[in-house]
């Protein structure tokens, strides 16, 4: 008896119930009044009294299994029927939408090219915080106490220091990174320092209150201004082309001596004069010079033994030069029409 019950249970579990016809055949064979389950219950009276509780339990489990399979099949078939009757919300005949393909921002593209050029010259990359203390941003770079760059009109101060509390500001250049490198490392040093900088300037076609800057520092024995010029010329030729024209002008920076500014022929007018170059025919691309002895001393480097040069350039202005863009504000406005022009 027990073997027959287990065999019937196996048949119930394996019976296919994917159609209404299969479900009806299942009922007729197992669950109706004259079906197999009822017939097995009828034979319970012939079982020995000692075995009746166990066999009765097996029969009840068999009946529950059969009824459960019937109810599950009914629910599944009803759901399938309803889904066929309801119209689909998905119209497979509609044309698909093309996914939007982004591209590298021109500032990041040019900055990456700059890094590659200087990496090939042996420069490594150094970074530092954008929120800086006045000591690193001004004092150790040989800025005079009354230098105009320290004024509120030129610098975004987060907190003005007093007593032992230092000034806290948004860095106006990446030169503080050079200070940190010189304090932490011993010469020879050859690094570039890319990053965002902030200045309290009027926004115009040529200037913005936040921009990207890349500075370089090289300290070694017997470094000369000729080494600096060779580096600048090599960079400019790789960035703007071998026929680029440069102009070095004497200038003043507190942290370099002697100092110079480097101009390149205006990309819009070709040197004839326009509103972008203010009718001069030239555009400034960077400032440079030999590291001031006071800066070296402030960082614990003996200027009698070591010398070096430094330079700094605006990455955004280089983007304007390279792609002939006449307004720096376009780089920060997130106008997708402009950005789509730089797809690879």
From Swiss-Prot:
Presence of the UniProt keyword ATP-binding in the record: yes
UniProt keyword terms in alphabetical order: Aminoacyl-tRNA synthetase, ATP-binding, Cytoplasm, Ligase, Magnesium, Metal-binding, Nucleotide-binding, Protein biosynthesis
Cofactor remark: Binds 2 magnesium ions per tetramer.
Annotated compartments: Cytoplasm
Example of a GO biological process term: phenylalanyl-tRNA aminoacylation
Chain positions recorded as Mg(2+) binding sites: 257
Catalytic activity entry: tRNA(Phe) + L-phenylalanine + ATP = L-phenylalanyl-tRNA(Phe) + AMP + diphosphate + H(+)
InterPro entries: aa-tRNA-synth_II (IPR006195), aa-tRNA-synth_II/BPL/LPL (IPR045864), Phe-tRNA-synth_IIc_asu (IPR004529), Phe-tRNA_ligase_II_N (IPR004188), Phe_tRNA_ligase_alpha1_bac (IPR022911), Phenylalanyl-tRNA_Synthase (IPR002319), tRNA-bd_arm (IPR010978)
Any one of the GO CC terms: cytoplasm
Keyword field contains Transmembrane: no
Family as reported in the entry's similarity comment: Belongs to the class-II aminoacyl-tRNA synthetase family. Phe-tRNA synthetase alpha subunit type 1 subfamily.
NCBIfam families, sorted: pheS
Name of the protein in its database record: Phenylalanine--tRNA ligase alpha subunit
Organism ancestry: Bacteria, Pseudomonadati, Chlorobiota, Chlorobiia, Chlorobiales
């Amino acid at each position: 008896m027990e073997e027959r019950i287990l065999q019937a249970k196996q048949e119930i579990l394996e019976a296919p119930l994917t159609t209404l016809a299969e479900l009806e055949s299942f009922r007729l064979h197992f669950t109706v009044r004259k079906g197999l389950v009822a017939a097995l219950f009828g034979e319970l009276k012939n079982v020995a009294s000692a075995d009746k509780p166990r066999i009765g339990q097996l029969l009840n489990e068999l009946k529950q299994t059969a009824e459960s399979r019937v109810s599950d099949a009914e629910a599944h078939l009803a759901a399938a029927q309803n889904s066929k009757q309801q119209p689909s919300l998905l119209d497979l005949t509609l044309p698909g939408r093309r996914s939007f393909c982004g591209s590298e921002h021109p500032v990041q593209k040019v900055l990456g090219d700059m890094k590659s050029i200087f990496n090939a010259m042996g420069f490594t990359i150094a970074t530092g915080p954008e929120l800086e203390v006045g000591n690193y941003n001004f004092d150790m770079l040989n800025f005079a106490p009354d230098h105009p760059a320290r004024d509120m009109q030129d610098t975004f101060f987060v907190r003005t220091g007093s007593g032992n509390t230092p000034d806290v500001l948004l860095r106006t250049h990446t030169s503080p990174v050079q200070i940190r490198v010189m304090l932490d490392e011993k010469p020879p040093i050859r690094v570039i320092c890319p990053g965002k900088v902030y200045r309290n300037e009027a926004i115009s076609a040529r200037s913005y209150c936040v921009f990207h800057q890349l500075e370089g520092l090289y300290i070694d024995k017997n470094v000369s201004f000729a080494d600096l010029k060779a580096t600048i010329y090599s960079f400019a030729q790789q960035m703007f082309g071998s026929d680029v024209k440069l102009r070095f002008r004497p200038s003043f920076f507190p942290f370099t001596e002697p100092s110079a500014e480097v101009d390149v022929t205006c990309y819009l007018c070709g040197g004839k004069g326009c509103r972008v170059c203010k009718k001069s025919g030239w555009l400034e691309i960077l400032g440079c010079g030999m590291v001031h002895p006071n800066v070296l001393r402030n960082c614990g480097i003996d200027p009698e033994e070591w010398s070096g040069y430094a330079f700094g350039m605006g990455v955004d202005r280089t983007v304007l030069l390279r792609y002939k863009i006449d307004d720096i504000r376009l780089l920060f406005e997130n106008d997708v029409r402009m950005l789509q022009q730089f797809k690879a």
